[in-house]
Amino acid sequence: MAVHKEVNFVAYLLIVLGMFLYVDAKACTRECGNLGFGICPRSEGSPLNPICINCCSGYKGCNYYNSFGKFICEGESDPKRPNACTFNCDPNIAYSRCPRSQGKSLIYPTGCTTCCTGYKGCYYFGKDGKFVCEGESDEPKANMYPVM
């Protein structure tokens, strides 16, 4: 009987420790950020609803395709330091595919977003337009303390 109690205790302990490892140990503070806007490279457009962009101004990490699905190029512009490109549309590009495809591409206003609560893969800028940080959260965290 004592062996069963020890086994149960060890199993319970492993489950509790596993839960602590699974939970994100990093807690974000409740202060609001002073961010101006955020850019999150996202998939856009489709063969039937093409986008207006060119390879120079397309985001690094995003691939651009024509309406038949043929690869045209990878974006060349780093959201942290955008290229000085013309804003001419490349008529060959119909749509993009980026690693993160959900949510908005431009976050404005940022509300109470901080670098800690912002999405990984999104780039946040101050009100002066200068790069501040990349988001640190794998998933959006609920804002428990909304701006009053």
UniProtKB/Swiss-Prot annotation:
The record marks 87-88 as: Reactive bond for chymotrypsin. One of its GO terms (cellular component) is extracellular region. GO terms for molecular function: serine-type endopeptidase inhibitor activity. It is found in: Secreted. SUPFAM superfamilies: Plant proteinase inhibitors. Induction: Mechanical damage (i.e. insect chewing) to this plant results in the systemic release of a factor from the wound site. Within the leaves it induces the cytoplasmic synthesis of proteinase inhibitors I and II. Sequence repeats lie at residues 26-81, 83-141. Keywords: Disulfide bond, Protease inhibitor, Repeat, Secreted, Serine protease inhibitor, Signal. Coiled coil: none annotated. The record marks 30-31 as: Reactive bond for trypsin. Disulfide bonds join 28-116, 32-112, 40-122, 52-89, 55-73, 56-85, 62-98, 115-133. Residues 1-25 form the signal peptide. Pfam families: Prot_inhib_II. Belongs to the protease inhibitor I20 (potato type II proteinase inhibitor) family. Potent inhibitor of both trypsin and chymotrypsin. This is Wound-induced proteinase inhibitor 2.
